[in-house]
């Protein structure tokens, strides 16, 4: 039998299988169990009462987390004219049109978010096979195709997260770093849940938010007592 690492032993000793933790208790325990050298991300998984096989029950959107994600975000914007100047002023890392597309075709894809104004989609459309598999293709449903590129840049830099139900009807999102105060992590999760509830498909029946699980990059998943969340 493989020998347990020190961290695995700590998890086995301190995590109670099947227990529902209050949010604060879960956040503190994950921080206590985080013994690796880099600051782990804190992630949330939300099981929704939807049938992802039905197109009208796919839940997707974006939330600006009030306390950010703790990550620096690189943003590229496809636009031109005054909108390009506004995007740069808002903090975009790169702004362009055909020349930016050429750079991406050449392999320069060191971006976390790609935004486009509607008039730039003729250029961005050529990049579907490059941006699509990386989750970078601009989409109006998550606010990355918009005439107001400056606001989209500000949102991305402020810690906007994009989400979509997976094949099991689960939303996955980063909600901060393990060194965030529990209250700030909770505010981020509650903001996400509020948007998920706002986007509830009309055809979804029964319990909508079924389960919320909090975890770190390398840590265990802890089920959250929904009564401890305000959203």
From Swiss-Prot:
GO cellular component: cytosolic large ribosomal subunit
Keywords, comma-separated and alphabetical: Repressor, Ribonucleoprotein, Ribosomal protein, RNA-binding, rRNA-binding, Translation regulation, tRNA-binding
Alphabetized SUPFAM superfamilies for the sequence: Ribosomal protein L1
Pfam families documented for this protein: Ribosomal_L1
One Gene Ontology molecular-function label: structural constituent of ribosome
Gene3D superfamilies attached to this UniProt entry: 3.30.190.20, 3.40.50.790
Gene Ontology biological-process annotations: regulation of translation; translation
Known function: Binds directly to 23S rRNA. The L1 stalk is quite mobile in the ribosome, and is involved in E site tRNA release.
Subunit text: Part of the 50S ribosomal subunit.
Family, as annotated: Belongs to the universal ribosomal protein uL1 family.
Stated name of the protein: Large ribosomal subunit protein uL1
Organismal lineage: Bacteria, Pseudomonadati, Pseudomonadota, Gammaproteobacteria, Pseudomonadales
């Amino acid at each position: 039998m493989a020998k347990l690492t020190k961290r695995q032993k700590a998890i086995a000793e301190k995590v109670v299988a099947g227990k529902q933790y209050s949010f604060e208790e879960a956040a503190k325990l994950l921080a206590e169990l985080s013994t690796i050298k880099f600051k782990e991300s804190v992630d949330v998984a939300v099981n929704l009462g939807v049938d992802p096989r039905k197109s009208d029950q796919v839940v997707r959107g974006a939330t600006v987390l009030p306390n950010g994600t703790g990550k620096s975000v690189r943003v590229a914007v496809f636009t031109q004219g005054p909108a390009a100047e506004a995007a740069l002023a808002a903090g975009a890392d790169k702004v362009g049109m055909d020349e930016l597309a050429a750079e991406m075709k050449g392999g320069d894809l060191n971006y976390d978010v790609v935004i486009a104004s509607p008039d730039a989609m003729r250029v961005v459309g050529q990049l579907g096979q490059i941006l699509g598999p990386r989750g970078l293709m601009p989409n109006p449903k998550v606010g990355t195709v918009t005439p107001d590129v400056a606001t989209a840049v500000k949102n991305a830099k402020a810690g906007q997260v994009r989400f979509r139900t997976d094949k099991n009807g689960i939303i996955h999102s980063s909600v901060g770093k393990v060194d965030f105060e529990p209250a700030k992590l909770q505010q981020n999760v509650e903001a996400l849940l509020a948007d998920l509830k706002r986007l509830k498909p009309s055809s979804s029946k029964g319990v909508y938010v079924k389960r919320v699980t909090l975890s770190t990059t390398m840590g265990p998943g802890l089920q959250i007592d929904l009564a401890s969340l305000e959203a």
